[in-house]
Amino acid sequence: GRDGYIVDTKNCVYHCYPPCDGLCKKNQAKSGSCGFLYPSGLACWCVALPENVPIKDPNDDCHK
């Protein structure tokens, strides 16, 4: 796995809601915590997330 800011299918971070630890574990990560990612703001950071779960691509924007 790898560490990173978990994102949805549109490359948008989760703003610490739902709570990060539960969100990350639901996606088979070891744990999660609330971090800050510029310029997105509050964002869930996951530890040891499986390769198939998308993480933030810093070269791409959130496509809402």
UniProtKB/Swiss-Prot annotation:
This protein's record includes keyword Cytoplasm: no
SMART domains: Knot1
InterPro entries noted in UniProt: LCN-type_CS_alpha_beta_dom, Scorpion_toxin-like, Scorpion_toxin-like_sf, Scorpion_toxinL/defensin
Keyword Secreted: yes
LCN-type CS-alpha/beta domain segment(s): 2-63
Tissue: Expressed by the venom gland.
CDD domains: neurotoxins_LC_scorpion
Location(s) in or outside the cell: Secreted
Domain of life: Eukaryota
SUPFAM superfamilies named in the record: Scorpion toxin-like
Disulfide bonds: C12-C62, C16-C34, C20-C44, C24-C46
Keywords on record: Disulfide bond, Ion channel impairing toxin, Neurotoxin, Secreted, Toxin, Voltage-gated sodium channel impairing toxin
Single GO biological process annotation from the record: defense response
Written domain comment of the UniProt record: Has the structural arrangement of an alpha-helix connected to antiparallel beta-sheets by disulfide bonds (CS-alpha/beta).
Similarity remark: Belongs to the long (4 C-C) scorpion toxin superfamily. Sodium channel inhibitor family. Alpha subfamily.
Function recorded in the entry: Alpha toxins bind voltage-independently at site-3 of sodium channels (Nav) and inhibit the inactivation of the activated channels, thereby blocking neuronal transmission.
Name of this chain's protein: Alpha-toxin Amm3
Classification of source organism: Eukaryota, Metazoa, Ecdysozoa, Arthropoda, Chelicerata
